[in-house]
């Protein structure tokens, strides 16, 4: 493995400034086409993550997804045994007619010993569980920089596990942690997957908002590797908000329209925070609004003729309008 230059632990906090500039750029040069309807020539499934209904059970997530018209479920693996039981997931899938679209590996900060404390074995177990449950994608976060050899060999190791198991391991974009005027770079090789040699990626709108990323530009850059989208929103807060799509300031509608227009192939999974909601009816409205948003902007809400656009290529002709790159210094 080639030597990597270790990035500094802290950098200047620029997320809010970037977010502000991006909003101003979109206001000056809107890219959303309100009168146009696009639908990818490939089927795009809209799923519901179990994290969107927490603390409800996996069974309740399947039932809610079925009731609201979702196409499938993403299961976040936690300490809860039912999230680690592929047979149970398969039974829920059979009972509701909804497949397990994806499994989220327990790679979060508070899950170091879920399944096993061995990081590579954890990914292998997750991939095997996903395959047994009928899912074709595992979502995972990049390592923390203190996770030793796992972090140093992450890019090549993820590819090896994917090849061994036949399951796609789609690495998710994250964000720098914040401390006053500084950003702490806790992820390795980076919270931003753009410059890493991954085969498969997941894009999360809330993480992008917290990081100050340009969602449209990023999706254009990673289009060929993008397998999975976490549908949510953010308002540029330093916290990972996971708002209902359309309730933040990210160009979520524009990005979904872009994916449909250029015939993207993958799954979109709603991952919104409903933990603060006390009434089940309020939670269901948030989840119903989320799938309605997805179906509208992916062209799935009605009989929309498929528009055969040119295949996506990495040219200025097909990329969304972008703002000038921000000066990092």
Residue map of PLM features:
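Conserved anion-binding
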Residues: 168-182
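Active-site beta-loop-alpha junctions enriched in small/polar residues
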Residues: 49-53, 76-80, 105-108, 143-145, ...
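Alpha-helix-loop-beta-strand connector modules within alpha/beta enzyme cores
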Residues: 90-106, 156-166, 191-196, 252-255
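Soluble or luminal CAZymes and related metallo-dependent hydrolases
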Residues: 57, 85, 118, 122, ...
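Short, structured loop/turn "capping" segments at alpha-beta junctions
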Residues: 165-171, 199-203
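Histidine-acidic metal/acid-base catalytic patches
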Residues: 4-7, 12-47, 54-66, 94, ...
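Structural motif corresponding to the early beta-alpha repeats
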Residues: 71, 75-152, 265, 274-277
């Amino acid at each position: 493995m080639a030597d990597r230059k270790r990035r500094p632990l802290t950098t200047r906090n620029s997320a809010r400034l970037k977010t502000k500039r991006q909003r101003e750029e979109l206001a000056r040069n809107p890219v959303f086409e309100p009168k146009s309807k696009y639908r990818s020539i490939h089927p795009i499934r809209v799923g519901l993550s179990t994290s969107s209904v927490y603390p409800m059970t996996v069974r309740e997530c399947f039932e809610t997804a079925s009731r609201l018209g979702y196409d499938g479920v993403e299961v976040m693996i936690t300490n809860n045994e039912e999230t680690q039981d592929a047979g149970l997931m398969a039974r829920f899938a059979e009972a509701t007619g909804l497949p397990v679209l994806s499994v989220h590996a327990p790679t979060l900060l508070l899950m170091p010993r879920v399944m096993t404390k061995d990081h590579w074995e954890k990914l292998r177990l997750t991939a095997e569980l996903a395959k047994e449950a009928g899912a074709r994608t595992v979502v995972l976060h990049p390592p923390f920089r203190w996770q030793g050899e796992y972090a140093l060999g992450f890019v090549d190791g993820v590819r090896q596990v994917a090849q061994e198991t036949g399951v796609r391991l789609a690495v998710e974009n994250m964000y720098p942690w914040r401390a006053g005027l500084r950003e702490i770079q806790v992820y390795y090789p980076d919270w931003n997957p753009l410059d890493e040699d991954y085969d498969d990626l997941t894009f999360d709108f809330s993480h992008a908002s917290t990081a100050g990323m340009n969602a449209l530009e990023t999706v254009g850059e990673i289009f060929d590797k993008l397998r999975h989208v976490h549908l949510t929103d953010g308002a540029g807060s330093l916290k990972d908000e996971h708002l209902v799509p359309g309730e933040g300031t990210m160009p979520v509608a524009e990005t979904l329209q872009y994916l449909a227009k250029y015939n993207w192939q993958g799954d979109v999974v709603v991952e919104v925070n409903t933990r603060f909601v006390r009434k089940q009816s309020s939670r269901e409205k948030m989840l119903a609004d989320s799938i309605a948003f997805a179906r509208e902007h992916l062209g799935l809400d009605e009989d929309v003729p498929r528009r055969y656009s040119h295949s996506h290529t990495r040219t200025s002709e097909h990329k969304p309008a972008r703002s000038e790159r921000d000066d990092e210094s």
